[in-house]
Amino acid sequence: GLFSFNTPNFILRFALGKTDYQLGVEDYRRFAAEYEYFGRSVWQQTLNLTAEEQRQLITLLEKNYRPENRIYRYNFFYDNCATRPRDKVEESLQKSGSQLLFSNAHTENGETKSYRDIVHQYTKGHPWAQFGIDFCIGSQADHPINDRQMMFAPFYLMDAFAGARIANTSDNKALVASTKKIIDCEPDVSDSAENDIWNM
C-alpha cells in the first residue's frame, strides 16, 4: 500500500483516519530486498484454499486494484493494511459457499486489551511516535476491544489466521496450511515489539 507523505498535515490525518491509501503492486524480489535492508522480518502464511476459493480471491484482488477502486480512505484501526486482506479472504470464501470462523482466544483467556495497549506494544522504544499517536487517537482508544478488532495489528491478524477455520456444508478445515519465516531479521517484532507503528 502507498501513502503520499506530501499530503498536508499527513501525520495528523493518518492518526485521525483521514488519509487516502492506494493499493500498490510490487515485484516480490524488490519487496523482500527492502524489508531485509531495513531489518524487518517477514512471515508467510500459506492459505489452505481450493482452486475455486483461490480463483475467487484473485478475482477480488484484481477488482480491488482497478483504478476506480485502488484508492480508499485509510482508517488506522478499522480499514488498514491488515483488515483489508482479512476482509477480502472472508469475502472470497463467502462467494465460494464457505464461511471463515475465527476463535476468540484472547478474550476467552480473559485477556483485556485496548487499541492503545496494542499501539504501545508496537511503539515501544519510540516515545515521540507513541506520544504523537496517543495525542491523536483520543479516549475511544482506551475501551476494551474484541479479538476481531485486535486484527488491525498484523501480528494479531497472523495469530487469528493461524487459529481460523474454513467451514461449509461438507468440510471444516484450517485456514492456514503452513507458516514460515521467509526473511529472518533480529530483533523480531513478534518477540520484542520494537518496530515502530509505521511498519504495521
Label each PLM-derived region with a short phrase.
Residues K63-M200:
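Activation targets extended, charge/polar-rich intrinsically disordered C-terminal tails
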Residues E34-W43, K63-N69:
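Acidic/histidine-rich, surface-exposed loop or edge segments in extracytoplasmic proteins
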Residues L49-N64:
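A structural motif
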Residues G1-R40:
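Glycine-rich catalytic cores of cysteine/serine-nucleophile enzymes that process amide/ester linkages
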Residues T46:
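Glycine-rich phosphate-binding "P-loop"
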Residues L2, T19, E52, G138-Q140:
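Generic structural motif
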